Design a protein with these regions (language model features):
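Core of compact, soluble alpha-helical bundle domains
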Residues: 1-140
């Protein structure tokens, strides 16, 4: 029996390391970081870890908002979504994640594009609309 994608990725410690590196990579990427200017990075970290863990067959349960609701009003372009995917692939490469596993993760996350992208444009680096309401911070 083949191990789950979660297990092949290295479990919770590996997923956490990948998410933290990815979050930092996105924060440094001028093509997309304006969309995260008002984001609670602690919340983002937790939500991403839970989402990736659950999506790959791990024991976590993602309890955040749907991708459509979470990104509604952000004005995310196709170009910005593609830049985010490029950052994710670069993160996977940094951690020597195998091509098979990368493909499986991208196959799970790729369909979310239609829920996240609001503008069919190759433009990147667009600001977060002033009217966008960010999620509340996690209780600490």
């Amino acid at each position: 029996m083949e191990r789950s994608l979660y297990e092949r990725l290295g479990g919770m410690d590996s997923i956490t390391a990948v998410v933290e590196n990815f979050r930092d990579r996105v924060a440094a990427d001028d093509r997309i970081n304006k969309k995260f200017a008002r984001t609670d990075l602690v919340r983002l970290r937790k939500m991403l870890i839970d989402q990736v863990c659950e999506a790959t067959g791990g024991p976590c349960q993602y309890t955040g908002r749907s991708m459509k609701v979470a990104h509604e009003g952000m004005g995310v372009t196709s170009g910005e979504f593609d830049a985010l995917v490029q950052d994710l692939v670069a993160t996977f490469d940094h951690f020597n994640v195998g091509q098979k596993e990368q493909g499986e993760v991208l196959a799970v996350l790729g369909p979310l594009k239609t829920e996240i992208v609001e503008l069919d444009s190759s433009q990147v680096g667009t600001p977060l609309p002033a009217a966008y309401e960010v999620a509340s911070a996690l209780a600490r």
